[in-house]
């Protein structure tokens, strides 16, 4: 048994379930497959998300056309936040309303109230219930503004929104950060790739590296890391002494 004083979380996230399942189902994972797993945007029907989303389908929406429309979108949702389905955006919002309570092991919010709150919010912010996920979920920094996919509890993590934007859209402010894949070839040579949401110059807006990784990041791509001195020198843009 676990001591209650250790603070060990016994719940399983969707990320944990999806990561375990995807890696267990592949006996030999290539670097490309591993990176694809990291960028997975799906929800497992064995996760907490299934029971929560099912509870929204149980809401009686008779006499309320907007609630009925939201429920229909939920029913048509394809269990992914890849931006391909017209229900992805509202599904993400519905999941997000319950995610903190689930993480804290608190009672989940009332399904009808959550459905109504989401309908009201989407109607006010976007004028429709089925905006494309990438249209409303944005990665923003400086003058760069890009569509961002992924979800609250997916391996491709976009776990929190900053909703106080002038245009009413949702700026991603929490989720994936620095990601690196390191491997060694048969000769023992290290090969690595990395990416982060914005750029290496994290607090220098005047630098070209303040936002230069954003396009790669939203595309789920990586850049090479020039680890060896000779390789770094070959790709250097400028040489200087601090």
Model-derived features with residue positions:
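C-terminal/peripheral segments of proteins
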Residues: 1-242
